[in-house]
Structures are given as C-alpha cells and as structure tokens.
C-alpha cells in the first residue's frame, strides 16, 4: 500500500472521529491546525516520554532475556506455568525492540514510512493481547490444579505448548486490523504520524475496531481471570494451604501488575468511546483531559514490559537461585556463595505443577 497523502483525506474522515483509538495503545496524532481544540498533551512532554521509553527498553531487554535464560536453563524441571511465563517474557522482549522507534517518533514524528509503521504497530498489539490471554490461561491452569485438584489433559506439556501457540494465533488475528489499516500519514503543518487510514468509512470502522478487540481481547479474559482466581483463593484459604498460597504469590503479583498497568488505559479508552458516541458531551477541556490521560496511561502500559522480571527477582526465590546457579556455572560467582543460598524446595500440588522455576 502506498504511503498516505493528505490530499485524498477529507476533514470529516479524519476529525469527524478524531479519536485515540487504537486499542494499539498509541496516542493519536496531534494536528493543531485541523482540530478546533488545541492539543496540550504531547508537545511539552515529548522528551520526557523519550527518556522513559529508552529506560523501559533497556530494563525490558535485560530483564526478559534473563527470565528466558533461567527458564530454558531449567527446562528439565520446567512446569506448565513456566511455559506460560516463558511466552510472556518472549512477548515483552519483542515489544521492547520496538520502543526505540516509538521513542524517536515522539520527538521527530513518524519518519519511518508505512511498512515499518505496520510492523511495529502489529508487534505492540500482539504483545498486549498475548499478555492478557496467557495470563488467562495461567488462571485456568491454577484453577484446575488447586480447586479441582486433578490432573487434566491441560497439564501435558505438549498440549500446553499448543495452547500457547494458539494464543499467539488469536493475538495475531485480533491485531490484523492494525496491519491492514495503519499507514504513515502526512498532515499539513504537522509532523507525520503512524495512524489508521480507513477511507470514507473511518468513523464507523474505527468504533467497530475499538469495541470488538476490547471485548474479546481484554474484557472476556479479565472476567475469566476474575472467576478463576476468586475460587482459587477461596480454596486456598478454606483448606489452609499455606505452602500453595506462597507458591502462588509470583503468579498473583504478575496478574496484579498487568492490571495496574493496563486497566487505567482501558478505562480512559472507554471514557473516550463514550465521548465519541455522545454518551458524554465532548468539550475542548474534556478532549484535552482525555488526551493527557491517554498520554500518561500509555506510558504506564509500556512500563509493564519491564516489570515482570523485577517481580521475579524480588518475590521468586527459585528465579534468584536459578540465576545464581547459571552465574556459578560460568565462574562469575563462587560455588561457596551459591552454597549459602539454600534452594527452596519445590511445592507439589495434586497436579504436580504448582511449583514454578520462578
């Protein structure tokens, strides 16, 4: 598809639904000359965003690489949950590779053309959807293992790998609209942007493509997690399963951090949707408030990609031991120092899979 030019794009098509869509998590273009409300969200913050993106990129690159290394190094004792967490680390690492590009675009505008616009936008979408879908899979796995305390077909590792592959496939399908409609756009008197081009049906399709992915890629998996963890926690507390409860701390922390990072963005996006459909009256003040909120919550969502390894380092005893074991094997720390670290015993559930490498 050729790069988009402003001459073929009508005012109504663009500003008629001048939205912060994109379940893709990135902010809309700032078109000061074509909007009746002067945007106040990005101009003064571009360098703050740039620095934040670069820091998240470096932390995510290091942290998720270490997580993958530890899990793969311990693959002989790798549990079902570890397979899911490995895929989470892969998703976050892939997303981190796009952050330098997004950081540069915040300062200089989108100067990378349409092909790269499509690719990096697709990676962002797939990262988000795969993250919440894999967390939903973990919640179902823990629900079956603890609440029903039975070994199920889902515990077989080759089937778990198939489930992970399926989640990647679903994430890709949910992200296809971004691949199809994203283009480099060159508005007059403004920096180029990476944004949706849907022709004469921009307003209609943008709302459809906002609601459907939000329903199937966020709300439904969130309800699954809520159901599973409510009953899982109830079972743990009723049975006084202290050891299993401690083994679940890492998983609960991962889910909680995901929600803390992404729920604010989705709530702001919901508010923006209500404003676009005139359920909430739109004013210049409210529009700028929404733009600023999306700016801030997007950064919070991006921050998530580097937080899981930090959780593992502070809460996951087995992750710390596994990392020290790798360092000792390569002579980077003494074996005497490793011996001082008592390896925590693996906690076995009825399904044999409550323990994780992390």
From Swiss-Prot:
Query: Which GO terms label this protein's molecular function in UniProt?
Result: C-C chemokine binding; C-C chemokine receptor activity; C-X-C chemokine receptor activity; interleukin-8 binding
Q: Where in the cell is it found?
A: Cell membrane
Q: Give a short account of its post-translational modification.
A: Phosphorylated upon ligand binding; which is required for desensitization.
Quick check: keyword Iron-sulfur in the entry?
A: no
Q: How does it sit in the membrane?
A: Multi-pass membrane protein
Q: Which cysteines are joined by disulfide bonds?
A: 117-194
Chain segments annotated as transmembrane? 47-73, 83-103, 119-140, 162-181, 207-229, 250-271, 293-313
Q: Does the keyword Transcription regulation apply?
A: no
In the UniProt record, which residues carry a glycan? 8, 20
What does the record say about tissue specificity? Answer: Expressed preferentially in neutrophils.
Which SUPFAM superfamilies does the record associate with it?
A: Family A G protein-coupled receptor-like
Q: Which residues lie on this side of the membrane: Extracellular?
A: 1-46, 104-118, 182-206, 272-292
Q: CDD domains per the record? A: 7tmA_CXCR1_2
Give the matching Pfam families. Answer: 7tm_1 (PF00001)
Any one GO BP annotation for this protein = immune response
GO cellular component terms, semicolon-separated: external side of plasma membrane
| Keywords from the UniProt entry | Cell membrane, Chemotaxis, Disulfide bond, G-protein coupled receptor, Glycoprotein, Membrane, Phosphoprotein, Receptor, Transducer, Transmembrane, Transmembrane helix
Description of how the protein assembles with itself and partners:
Interacts with IL8. Interacts with GNAI2.
PANTHER family under this entry? C-X-C CHEMOKINE RECEPTOR TYPE 2, CELL ADHESION MOLECULE
Q: Which family does it belong to?
A: Belongs to the G-protein coupled receptor 1 family.
What role does it play?
Receptor for interleukin-8 which is a powerful neutrophil chemotactic factor. Binding of IL-8 to the receptor causes activation of neutrophils. This response is mediated via a G-protein that activates a phosphatidylinositol-calcium second messenger system. Binds to IL-8 with high affinity. Also binds with high affinity to CXCL3, GRO/MGSA and NAP-2.
Instruction: Spell out the protein name for this chain.
Output: C-X-C chemokine receptor type 2
Source organism of the structure? Oryctolagus cuniculus
